[in-house]
C-alpha cells in the first residue's frame, strides 16, 4: 500500500504541474502542436475508426517508426517499455505481453484483428507466432476488451497490424521497404523486405519476408542466482557447462525465426477484397535448471521447433446495405504445430488448427448516435501428443454477437456495448495412449459468458479530456485449465486442471486524465478490477517426478494500480513568421515567441523530458496473500530531442524490488538500466532512409525479471549496442 500511495502522489504531482503550466501559457501555445503523437487511428477498436483519445479505454499505439527501434525477437519484449505492459520473459525466444499484471488466457493476441492461433497462452515457454519486424503498428488495449474480442480479452488486447493484404491503391506501381539490424548483446542479426506491386488499376499484390537469428544471451555475471549457486558442489561451481555454473553467457538461449507472406487485393472506390498466405517458423532454446535435472549428468538441450501456416481473407465495403455505412468481414484459418525436443527426442508435440471469422456492420448515424453490430464464429482443435503429453485432444467452439454504440453530446461522448457468446469444449477420451490423463470429473463443458461496458469521454477544456470506463466481463475457462493433467518438462512443472471451474467474473473501472496540447502532454490512468472465480495457476509446494506441481484454482482476487506518461516540452511549441511590413519594425520583438501581429507556425524541433511509470497491486482475497508474478513498480525518465531529420534520447529506467510475493515465490531485486539512442533520416534519390544506434543496459547491471518462471537461471541481457537501418521507396 505504501508503494501505491507513493506512486499515486507522484502521478498526482505530475497532473497538478500540468494544470499549473496550462494556466500560464499564452493562448497560441495551446494549439495541439503534438497532436500527431496522440491522434493515431485505433484499428482494433471496432469497425469505426477511432483515435486513442476517442476511446474510453486506455489504449496505446506504437507506430511504424517507433517499432523499428523497439522491435525485439519476441512480442513481449517489444512492448515491455510501454506503461502498463511487460513481458513474461521466459526465454529470449518466448516472451508474451503482460498487461496490468494479467497474462496468458486473459490477454488476447491478434493479427489484424483476428486470432493468432498458437499455444502461447497455454504455457510461458510457448512464443507468440507473430513478428514485429514488418508490422505497421502494434495496438494495446489495457483493461477488459471482451465486448469486441471475447472472453479471452478480459485483461486486454494486443493487435499486430501489417500490410500483407493491401486495403487501398498505392500511388506508384512499385513500392517497398528493406530493414536490417544488429545487436551485440546476443549477436542478433535480423533483416526484412516488403514489396507492394500494382500492375493495373484495382489490383495490388504484396510480398514480404523477415529473418532473425541470435546466439546465446550475454549476461554480466553468473546465469544462476546466489541461492542456486550456494547449493552447488565445489566441482560444479567451477564448471561452465550445462547443469553447472555458466558465467557471461547463458547456454541454449538462441533464437532462429523466419517468416514470409504473400497477399493480393482487388481495390475499388467503395472498398476492397483480399487474401493472403503466411508461414512462421521458429526454433529457440530453453536454458537448463540444475535443480530439476541430475547435476551429475549433462542434460539434454531442450528446444522448441515452431511451424505455423495461415490463410487470411478480408473485405471492407462502403454502403453495402440500407441502414449501414460499412461492412467489414474477416476470416482466418490456421494450422500450427510445435515440437518440444529434449536432446534428440521429441518429448511433446502441440498441434492446433482452427477458424476465426467475424462480420461487423457500421450503422448510419441516428441523430447523435452511431455504432456497430457484429458477430463472430471461432473454432479450435488442440492436441498434445508424446511422452510429456498433459492434455487430451479437445475442440472449442465459440459463437458470439456484440454491439457497440456511441452517443455524441457536444463535449461529452457516451460509449456502451454488450456481448454474449456461447462456448462449448469437447474433450476426446478415445485415445488409449492418453487414458492416464482422464480425470474422474471429466466431461464436455458449455459456458455462456456475458459482458457489458459503459464509458464517458468529457472534453472539458481545450486539449484536456477525462475518460471513465466501467466494465462487467466474464471469461470461460479453457480446455487446459479444465482438463490438463501431466508433466511439462520445458517449464519444469506438473500441471493439474480443474474440471469444476466456472466462468471468471470481473467488475472493473478505468479512469484516465489526458492532455493532448500545450507544454505538458500525456495521460494518467488508474484502474480497479475485482474478480470472482479468478482462475489462478497456483503452486502447491508438492513435487511429482521431480517437477513442481501447479493446480488451476478458483479464487476471489483484486487488481488495482496506475500508469502515467508525461512529456514536458522544453522548446516553444510555435515559432513566428513575421509579416513583410513588420520585418523591419523594432516594435515587433514579440515575434520571437508569439504575438498579435505574428503568424504562429509549428516548431519543427522538439526537446522534451518524458516521465513515466506504472504500478500494479494484486491480491488473493480468499487468503490475503499476493498473487504470483506481478509486475513490480517501474518508472523512468528520459530526455528526448527530435527534428525533421534527427532524433536522440537518453533514458534512466528503474524497476523496483518485488518483495510482495505469493506463497512458494521468491522476491526479486530491483535494478536500474541506462539506455540511449540516436537516429537520422535522409533521402537518396527516390529512397527514404533511416539509420539508428541504440544502447541498452549501458552500465552492464545484473538484473532478473520477476515475471519469469526462469528468473533464477536466466538473467536479463547485459550491455548491448544495436545498429539498424530502414529504407523505403
Locations of the language-model features?
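Short acidic/polar hinge/loop motifs at secondary-structure boundaries
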Residues: 115-144
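Flexible loop and strand-edge segments within Gram-negative outer membrane beta-barrel domains
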Residues: 251-257, 270-327, 333-354, 387-395, ...
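C-terminal beta-signal and adjacent terminal beta-strands/loops
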Residues: 474, 530-532, 582-596, 603, ...
